[in-house]
Amino acid sequence: MCQVVLPFLSVSLRDFYHSASTTMIQQENLKKRLARLAAPIFIETLLIMMLGAVDTVMLSRHSDNSVAAVGVVNQIIMLTFLVFEVINLGTSVLCSQYLGARLHKQVVQVVGVSLLVNFAVGVGISMLLFGCAEPILRLMGLGPELMQDGMDYMRIVGAFAFFQALSLTLSASLRSANKAVYPMLVTVVVNVLNIIGNYSLIFGRFGFPELGVEGAAISTAF
């Protein structure tokens, strides 16, 4: 009896440990893949949020009124980004499904439609932010002493919101293709250029005129 049972138990235990070891390795590989995907997305999102924060910090050396006005406008700008991200969420889901099924033609179609939709929505938002800057800021409770700075910043940054819409769509498409590192690197470069542009245009360095709030807006928009 023992001669029959012991080999059976030995084989069963060996299979169990082999299966458990394989499962643990698969889980570790999955964790590493998730980390490689999530880390660039987290960094990219953080850097996008830093664009407005950098403007606020650098403007604090120029004017207190500018800081207060830009802080209010940045809240509105971040809300518009949420609108774009709703469309991009659907883009990511569809692209991931089609890429998994190797339907590359459909992926191109989804990205194209998303770019068109976000471009149309972005143009509408740009027109709204540019044309209705004053009533929107009054609705947000911005005081008269801050109104001009707020309007200048909002009109310049808002007028080019559709560029950000297209950029976010392309980023979502690349993330769904497991290429999240490329949008992150682009965002790093954008932040560096924004800091240099702010320093040049806010304070009038390197031969540029001193533009204050308008300089920060131009640097952020472009």
Predicted regions and their residues:
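Short alpha-helical transmembrane segments in multi-pass integral membrane proteins
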Residues: 1-41, 95-162, 193-196, 208-222
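Residue-level signal for short hydrophobic patches within transmembrane helices
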Residues: 31-50, 54, 76-83, 159, ...
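Transmembrane alpha-helix boundary and packing residues in multipass membrane permease domains
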Residues: 41, 45, 56-57, 93, ...
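Recurrent gating helices in multi-pass secondary carriers
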Residues: 45-53, 126, 130, 191
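Helix-loop interface residues and adjacent transmembrane-helix termini in multi-pass membrane transporters
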Residues: 50-53, 61-64, 98-101, 176-177, ...
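Small-residue-rich hydrophobic transmembrane alpha-helices
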Residues: 56, 67-127, 164-176, 180-183
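Interfacial/gating helices of multi-pass transporter permease domains
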Residues: 59-78, 144-149, 213-218
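Alpha-helical transmembrane segments of multi-pass membrane transporters/permeases
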Residues: 118, 173-200, 217
